A protein has these predicted regions:
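Short acidic/His/Gly/Ser-rich catalytic and metal-binding motifs that mark active-site loops
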Residues: 65-68, 108-113, 153-158
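Non-membrane alpha-helical structural segments and their capping/turn regions in soluble enzymes
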Residues: 74-85, 124-128, 132, 170, ...
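Histidine-centered active-site loop/cap adjacent to the catalytic His
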Residues: 40, 44, 132, 144, ...
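A short helix->loop->beta-strand "cap" motif at the edges of active sites that frequently abuts
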Residues: 93-99, 143
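Substrate-gating cap/lid alpha-helix
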Residues: 109-148
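Conserved SGNH/GDSL esterase-like catalytic core that processes O-acyl groups on lipids
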Residues: 1-86, 90
Length: 189
């Protein structure tokens, strides 16, 4: 079975551990950060279709929900909804692969005056809005959900998140890799 992992820097943190946990599975992911939904959709042929996967595990949303320093949204919620729908269609129609959708992990601002992950302005509550929008779509499409947001919350997000309030500690990557490996194994049955 071939699995492609698509996602931002959060995926890049757990990917090497998932590969070690699933030695009988051909797990691959792009070397680069897949950033946001529009970026991933535009590179779907290179990152997904050309790899001919049986299963795609998708994890993006942080970059989509970012408020840029000028106060503009990186990807507005209506555009995000459209990108999620288009990505699902492209994977199903062109790659003929099954998919798992992973919710976006939480953000945490221990000091609201400090920048998070190099972005000076980020509203941590926006993750919930983007997760809700994606869940409405993927559930209506019958795509299984891997709730990585809940995994981090249940495992004490202050232990899972680095000081930047976005990226994972070693412990955070470990718990995410467990959840991703389990979700993949669940689709292999």
């Amino acid at each position: 079975m071939k699995v492609v992992l698509i996602g931002d820097s959060i995926r890049m943190g757990y990917q090497p551990i998932v590969i070690k946990k699933l030695p009988a599975v051909d797990v691959w992911g792009p070397v680069q950060n897949c950033r946001h939904s529009v970026w991933a959709h535009d590179r779907c042929k290179e990152w997904v279709i050309d790899e001919e996967p049986d299963l795609v595990h998708v994890n993006f949303g942080i970059h989509d929900s970012v408020l840029l320093p000028d106060g503009e949204h990186q990807i507005l919620l209506p555009q995000y909804r459209l990108s999620v729908r288009r990505f699902i269609s492209k994977v199903r129609d062109d790659a003929k692969a099954k998919m798992i959708w992973a919710t976006t992990t939480p953000l945490y601002a221990s000091d609201p005056d400090l920048p998070m992950a190099q972005w000076p302005i980020k509203d941590v509550s926006r993750i919930s809005d983007y997760n809700a929008a994606a869940l409405e779509i993927v559930q209506s499409e019958g795509v299984p959900v891997n709730d990585l947001h809940d995994v981090i919350v249940r495992n004490d997000f202050t232990k899972c998140l680095q000081e930047d309030g976005c990226h994972m500690t070693d412990f955070g990557n470990e718990v995410l890799s467990d959840a991703v490996a389990e979700a993949i194994e669940g689709q292999m049955r």
